[in-house]
Amino acid sequence: MTPTIRPDDPARATVEIATEDAAWDALDLEALAGRAVDATLVALDLPPAAFEVSILACDDARIATLNGEFRGKPTPTNVLSWPAEDRAPDTPGGAPHLPDPGDPMAAELGDLALAHGTCAREAAEAGKPLADHVTHLIVHGTLHLLGFDHETDADAARMEGLEVKILQTLNMANPYETPMV
């Protein structure tokens, strides 16, 4: 497992990808993840170059283990996130505590894990390209790293609204018009 880092571009976020499942090799995850993370940060008026995200590209078995270990749900899921800091809002539906780009401790936003089998199955069931679904999940996961969640209706409305806005900047359709299973 050798992490790959996107080509050095001073205006872009650093996205490190560790690929454990060769099925991910068919998708240009490096470019896709870079665009998704950058678009998320720009939408929140954060300079991408100030931040880092790490992604584990794994299979369903590995993510089921992680899901069981960290969430008590030993089943596959599409994406998991581990924020480097707790940025949760003070009240449901409120804005999270976004990082200060000038704070060197804020640089590492956290880690994401994506399961190829689950992502591919969900994309096929929804009739959407895998790249679009994975882009959405990286945007979704990056928002979790920044303190957004969907535990309450108010939080979900805020987070989903942002996801739609961000995906539109990437010329992608609203993923909530046809629910992903």
From Swiss-Prot:
Ubl conjugation listed as a keyword: no
EC numbers, comma separated = 3.1.-.-
Q: Which UniProt keywords apply?
A: Cytoplasm, Endonuclease, Hydrolase, Metal-binding, Nuclease, Ribosome biogenesis, rRNA processing, Zinc
Cofactors that this protein relies on: Zn(2+)
**Which GO BP annotation is one of this protein's?**
rRNA processing
Where does the protein end up? Cytoplasm
Q: Which free-text remark accompanies the cofactor?
A: Binds 1 zinc ion.
- Give me the residues that bind Zn(2+), please: H140, H144, H150
| Record-linked Pfam families | YbeY
The entry's cellular-component GO terms read: cytoplasm
> According to the lineage, what is the superkingdom?
Bacteria
Question: Recorded GO terms, molecular function?
Answer: metalloendopeptidase activity; RNA endonuclease activity; zinc ion binding
Q: Which HAMAP family match?
A: Endoribonucl_YbeY
Main role?
Single strand-specific metallo-endoribonuclease involved in late-stage 70S ribosome quality control and in maturation of the 3' terminus of the 16S rRNA.
Give the family per the record: Belongs to the endoribonuclease YbeY family.
For this entry, the protein name equals Endoribonuclease YbeY
Which species does the entry assign this protein to?
Dinoroseobacter shibae (strain DSM 16493 / NCIMB 14021 / DFL 12)
